[in-house]
Amino acid sequence: MEKFTMSETKVWSGRIDSADGPTAVRWHQQVRAPQEDSPAGVALIGYPCDLGVYINKGRVGAANGPDEIIKALANLPWRLTHPVYDCGNIQWEGELEDAQAALATKVFKQLQAGHSPIVLGGGHDVAWGSFQGLRRHLDQAAPDKVLGILNLDAHFDLRSDSEGASSGTPFQQIAKYCKTAGKPFHYAVFGISEYANTQALFDRADKLGVTYLKDTHCGYTQLGPMLRALDAFLSKVDCLYLTIDLDVLPAATAPGVSAPAAYGVPLEIVEAMLDAIQRKALPVLMADIAEYNPTYDIDSRTARVAARLAARLAGLLGKPTTKA
C-alpha cells in the first residue's frame, strides 16, 4: 500500500477544550492518516501547485493554499460522524502534467479504498487531475454511471489547450476526453462573470452544451430559479464531481484568490446550492476547492471561508464510494 504522509504536525494543531467534556473536540483532534484497513471516510489531498496559474498569466501563490486551508480547518469544531483522513500533499517533479498525473493517482487510490476525496488547491488545473483519477475509478467500479461535473466559478475554464494546459483549460481537456472516449460531457458552471470570459468562451460553452448561469442570476432575488436550474442539471446525472473555485465569491469575501471577482456569488448562495445537492441525495464522489492564494489574503479571511466550505463538503461527501 502507498505510504501516506500527513501534512506537517504543526498544521494540525489548535485549541483544546478538555474542561467542556468529550464533545468539545475540534478537527485537529480527529483527523488521522489513513491505514490499509481504515473505514470509509473523507480523504483530504493537497495539490500545492500553481504552475497552471502561471501559464495562464495569473498571479501565483496558490501553491501555498493547501496547508493554509488546513491551518484554518484544524481549529473548527468537529461535527461529523464519519472519519476524515489527511493524505498529505502530492509529491511530484517536473511540469504541470506531472503534478496532475500524481494527483490522479492519489485520487484513484483513495476512491478505490472507499474514501471520498476533497482536494485542496492549488490552481484550478487541479480539475484535470481529479477528473482523471475519478474517471479511472468509475471505469472500473461503475462504468455505466453518468457523471456530472458542477463547477462553482466565475470562469468557464474552457480555454484552448492547443498551446498547452493551464488553469484555464481543464474542462476543455475533459470535454475532449469525453468526446474521444464516447462519454457524455455533463458540465455545469454557476457564477459565470460576463466580464471575465470572452465571447469565444461563451460560444465554446454553447457548442459543448454547457449548462451555465451568470453571477447576476445567482443572487438572493434569483434563488428560486437558480435552484430549479441546479435541480434540472442534477436530474440528468447519476453521480457528481463538485469543484469550487473560490473566485466565484465576491472579492470582499474572498480577496485571497488568483483572480478576484468584482461581482461574485454570495457565500450564502453557494451554501444554498450545497444544501440543495444534499437534499437531492445524489452521490457526490469527490470535490475540489481551488485557487486559494494566501499571498493576497486579508486577515486569513479567504482561508476561513475555504475551511468552512471544506467542512461543509466533508459532511456532504461522507458516504462510502463504490469499490472496484
From Swiss-Prot:
Keyword Isomerase set for record: no
A GO biological process held by the record: putrescine biosynthetic process from arginine, via agmatine
Function (record text): Catalyzes the conversion of N-formimidoyl-L-glutamate to L-glutamate and formamide.
Binding site for Mn(2+) 2: 153, 155, 245, 247
HAMAP family: Formimidoylglutam (MF_00737)
Gene (UniProt): hutG
This protein's record includes keyword Hydrolase: yes
Family to which this protein belongs: Belongs to the arginase family.
Catalytic activity of the protein: N-formimidoyl-L-glutamate + H2O = formamide + L-glutamate
GO molecular function: agmatinase activity; formimidoylglutamase activity; manganese ion binding
UniProt-listed Enzyme Commission number(s): 3.5.3.8
Details of cofactor binding: Binds 2 manganese ions per subunit.
InterPro entries noted in UniProt: HutG, Ureohydrolase, Ureohydrolase_dom_sf, Ureohydrolase_Mn_BS
Entry-linked Pfam families: Arginase
Protein's organism: Hahella chejuensis (strain KCTC 2396)
The protein, known as: Formimidoylglutamase
Keywords from the UniProt entry: Histidine metabolism, Hydrolase, Manganese, Metal-binding
